Amino acid sequence: MDALVEARGLKKKFGKVTALSDLSVELPPGQPVAILGPNGAGKTTFIRMVATLIRPDEGTLRVGGRDVMREPMAVRRTIGLAGQAAAVEEMMTGRENLVMVARLYGQGRKEAVASAKRILSQMGLEDAADRRVKTYSGGMRRRLDLGASLVGAPRLLLLDEPTTGLDPGSRNEVWDAIREMGAGGTDIVLTTQYLDEADHLAAHIVIIDGGRVIAEGSPDELKSRVGADMVELHTADVETMRRAAEVLGALGVAEPSTDVATRRCSIAAPSGSKLLPLVVRALDDAGVAVEDIALRRPTLDEVFLALTGSTGSASSTSTDHIPTNPKEGAAA
């Protein structure tokens, strides 16, 4: 099966800043893809190239088999883009927003009204369809914005930080909408600053650092690269956590890690479940009581840290040094 997006040797500089440095990747069709990376890694630059908004200095980029440099208009007809901020008109109703977008796509009045009705249903916004958008919650606005990106029935939907700034409840609403869009046959590529979001939504994850791809695969494949499972324990207080870390360190298996905020301590378990009873025995001998203890897989956050040296929180809404000059954003 041909790649949905195929990049070869992409390079891009903004002044003295290198945004992309020999980036090569093939994004598979038929499964949602998440682009992860530290602040300034090149995520947004890459997404905007795929959207034909930025031209590469070097390299080739094909979307759906079409070269973005030679056939930008043909590429644009196959994609939808939802940026970091919801691009909706607050003084109009949700229905009016979608009808307006549909008319801009060239649909007649009757067809535009039908498109708006269909998308409002798909996004779960029927009850709020005739309310002004200024009365919507953040999650509702974001779902409306996602719906607007579907008006042209794109084969590929590009989502740049789709849940940034939303509360947990609104994030879950948007996650449900994204899952439904994917289930409906739309290919989705998203950038995100939330590792749990990538873990929940993506079947394929691409990690970018320093303007190039450093790892990719399914969440399980990436987690397996960290290596061993982890023995993790939770204590009642920080002092007990520190004592537990000393006990784990004395086992000589690996260096334990601690999280003061959650009072958790973990250690790599190369031997898997065989280490668990040894840890329990050592803690008991030292008189260290724990709230709970378990064997678990590495988290995506640990994968991210191992590969980039940054925690997930370092991946933010950076525009990757992209200038606002409209001439720089021209695709053709």
Residue locations for each model-derived region?
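Helix-to-loop junction immediately C-terminal to a conserved catalytic motif
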Residues: 51
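Conserved ABC transporter NBD signature motif
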Residues: 59-70, 75
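Conserved ABC ATPase "signature" region
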Residues: 99, 103, 110-128
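Catalytic Walker B motif of ABC-type/P-loop ATPase nucleotide-binding domains
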Residues: 157-160
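ABC transporter nucleotide-binding domain
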Residues: 175-270
